[in-house]
Amino acid sequence: MTTKAQSYLTHFRNIGIAAHIDAGKTTTTERILYYTGRTHNIGEVHDGAATMDWMEQERERGITITAAATTAKWKRSGTDQEYVVNIIDTPGHVDFTIEVERSMRVLDGAVAVFDSSQGVEPQSETVWRQADRYGVPRIAFSNKMDKTGASFELVLTDIKERLGAIPAPIQYPMGQENDFKGIIDIVRMRAHVYTNDLGTDIVESDIPAEFADKVAEMRAQLIEAAAEVDEDLMMMYLEGEEPSVEQLVSAIRKGTIEKKIFPVLCGSALKNKGVQLLLDAVVDYLPSPLEVPAIRGKVEDSEDTVEFPADPEGKLAALAFKIMADPYVGRLTFVRIYSGTLQSGSYVYNASKDKRDRVGRLLKMHANSREEVTELRAGELGAVIGLKDAGTGNTLIADGEDRVLLESIDVPEPVIKLAIEPKTKADQEKMGIGLQKLAEEDPTFRVESDQESGQTTISGMGELHLEILVDRLKREYKVEANVGAPQVAYRETITKAVDVEGKFVRQSGGRGQFGHVKIKAEPLEPGAGFVFENIVVGGTVPREFIGPAQKGIEEALQSGPMLGFPVVDMKVSLYDGSYHEVDSSEMAFKIAGSMALKEAVQKGAPAILEPIMRVEVTVPEDYMGDIIGDLNSRRGQIQGMEARGNAQIVKAFVPLSEMFGYATDMRSMTQGRASYSMFFDHYSQVPNNLAQQLMKK
């Protein structure tokens, strides 16, 4: 039951726009901003004027790096009802996957944009899976219908076959490629023909005879798909009755929110065709904050969970999903308010860090301009100035409440690293500050300093990711830096179970030191990370020393015996030990834990793990043999091939260490006619002969 206080939420939509790089996502967002009246002229990505791409590098490169959040308003066509649409434009480049993860976590619905000449591309698949993981309902937009090779059918087939989803086309294109002149609305059975370039003059008409049979067949399929999720419609369908437009819209909405069907629309954002109808579909089919399951939080030290319904009068629950350094106001924390109301000037409790923090000013964002507000209510997205400690994925609740944690954000491990040093010694400190600020904004970017060599290394998700961060260091923090060649972020692990002990005893006059632990270490499945278990019985290791022993073990994991890389995928069980009434201390047990772990890894048949990338190369048939031969020579495992138009897509798993400089080699092999995408898939053991070579380096 919706209360009066919640009624504004019925007309709220929090959506993300996500796709493969170059599918036309930012252009689609720009058009939405133009038609909702947030911008007075249309920003084109290819002339570097896009409003949403507000970082300098984004405008130069024509790709979206940070997820900009914008509030826009839209009146549903043919009605006076105004809707608030919060849009997050997410990057399509694989190196920026964390941005997509973050935005998926705080959305209620998404628009997946596909290039209709390419169908479902690899990054679109990744984004779709992320949306599946976070349970985000979505609609699909088959963009670029005017492009050579455009095919609405290709997109529908790919959604079914590559994504395993049920597409429900609610529109049909009137012609494609150069003949694309309008869109047929299958739900309302009307044709929309565009008569000017800006897409603002639309003539609505009956469906032309040439499309009548095809559209009638598609409408019958749409009603059948909608009837599967709506009992009332099913009864009408079985009795041969024709549903009204309202009944059909209501059933499609229900199926979309339950993630059983995925409405598919078509258009050309660049040519301004189909964008207003896309906005109508966002309003018609994607959920309001009241229609998605209420977020749950886990109560500290218990299995209990608490529900936070979307209600501005409820208890405050918010999630910080992005940190940004702003040249004018300092640190901006982007938040999604799930429940309650956040007031400027109030105090909040950061449950993730167990710290109290003060809210300064509150902003609603429009790409790179902002509007100051006094409060953010349940269902809203905004930015906070003044929070000192909040990080990505932190839970913010009302000051003084019990500690409750919302589900955080999955942060992938970086796979590539490089050494970095300032060009002048004078910039050393400035570089340190700049890198630290960049790492605060981006949890997939790590900065490490080697105490012995004094060398600083940075690690991230790919070459482009690190290149852009080094570029930002220069632009935003005025630090010129030299970087080394990219290196692979290896990991180490054990391959057999061992029992070991760590004993730290020091007697040198006065009070001594005594710590003693016995542990069992065993290998885990790849990707399982590290698991610690305390199974001490009878107090042989007192409770107050378990934590320090665990800390020592975890610190020792940071550097393995073979190459000094972190040790992963193992379980350590602390099962026994002994202590001394006087000499035992937290420090002694921490050292004992660390000693035990180092010995366990030495004795546990250690192995080196390397990141394996999922690579897809799109190549004309004539060059396919060369590409496959080359991937095999890079220790690649070919997973399969798939025809796409007159090209082939070769899919393979290839170690990252073999992929440096691949773009250049691929272009020269195919005279520039192939393209590829690559993203991290899993870690795998390095063959023995290569492990020996790595250790000699």
From Swiss-Prot:
One of its GO terms (molecular function) is translation elongation factor activity. GTP binds at residues 19-26, 89-93, 143-146. Residues 10-290 form the tr-type G domain. Keywords: Cytoplasm, Elongation factor, GTP-binding, Nucleotide-binding, Protein biosynthesis. GO terms for cellular component: cytoplasm. It is found in: Cytoplasm. GO terms for biological process: ribosome disassembly. Its main location: cytoplasm. PANTHER family: RIBOSOME-RELEASING FACTOR 2, MITOCHONDRIAL (PTHR43261:SF1), TRANSLATION ELONGATION FACTOR G-RELATED (PTHR43261). Belongs to the TRAFAC class translation factor GTPase superfamily. Classic translation factor GTPase family. EF-G/EF-2 subfamily. Catalyzes the GTP-dependent ribosomal translocation step during translation elongation. During this step, the ribosome changes from the pre-translocational (PRE) to the post-translocational (POST) state as the newly formed A-site-bound peptidyl-tRNA and P-site-bound deacylated tRNA move to the P and E sites, respectively. Catalyzes the coordinated movement of the two tRNA molecules, the mRNA and conformational changes in the ribosome. This is Elongation factor G. It comes from Deinococcus deserti (strain DSM 17065 / CIP 109153 / LMG 22923 / VCD115).
